[in-house]
Swiss-Prot record:
Compartments where found: Mitochondrion inner membrane
Pathway, per record: Cofactor biosynthesis; ubiquinone biosynthesis
Species, as recorded: Cryptosporidium parvum (strain Iowa II)
Topology versus the membrane: Peripheral membrane protein
The protein's assembly and partners: Component of a multi-subunit COQ enzyme complex.
Listed EC numbers: 4.1.1.130
InterPro entries: Coq4 (IPR007715), Coq4_euk (IPR027540)
Name listed for the protein in its UniProt record: Ubiquinone biosynthesis protein COQ4 homolog, mitochondrial
Family: Belongs to the COQ4 family.
Organism lineage string: Eukaryota, Sar, Alveolata, Apicomplexa, Conoidasida
Amino acid sequence: MNKFTNLLIKRTASSLKGGDFRELFRKNYIPITQFEKVLLSVTSCVEGLKNPTDSNSVACITELTSNRALRRLQILMNSTPDGRRIIKNRPLIDSSKYSIKDLMAFPDDSLGRRYGEFLTTYNLEINRDPVRYVNSEDLAYVLTRFRQIHDILHTAFELNITVESEVTLKLFEFLHAGIPFGAIGAFMGLFITPILKVRPKEIFENHNKTHVYPSKPIQIHQDCDKYLNSLEITKKEILYPKRIVIKELIPWIYKAEKKMRHNIYTIMVEDWFPRPIADFQNYLNISPPPKQLQKYTRIKPMPFC
């Protein structure tokens, strides 16, 4: 059991650094037996159900359930010139290639600049969790690429990091890449998507940021209770995330994925960093959610999101 416990290594985004993927694979790969794989899968699923925001469990489940999907995605990537270049050269979108400062140096409204703004807005790092339990170096790279594209999808679709946006994007990743955990994550995410959110329509500056656990069915933000109580009803914004996800966002992302001209995993998105994000969206034939949904999904500093 000591060996099994050691497998549940707490991941940090900073552990995926360096420019050579082979070196990263050798550094991070953990060989496990079939029995350990089953045990780790069950444990990760239980932990994931208890806390769907636990990135360690999510990463484990993805790696242990995606082998066939990764092979299909690898075949798809090899079917296009850009995809073959990606598979051959194994480029990384991480801190060994780009800093936030580098991204912010791209022109206004470029994909790279908007990506940097997204990371800055939510205080995110560019590095992603390393792949540990995929025993094929080639497939481990495909999963690494999949993870590194995630925040670029947020940027391209203009989706924030609320539970409702993450559920929407997980479903997209399942439809677009076939990764099983996309469907599992979207399903689990529906259970922790709040039924109700209450916040002031105008976000005021002098607030105290507090964490609101995302599985609370009704989110009334504690740091602005007095402020909300002093507002007239017309100045309060009441949101219904769970209903919107089921009735609006899921149908929208399903249609959006079906009408895309190209698969994003077959594209050297780095080549688009200096170009306008609108050109990238037009090339893929994607667009942000409809205007009436953007109060749920818009990318902006939202202390009460």
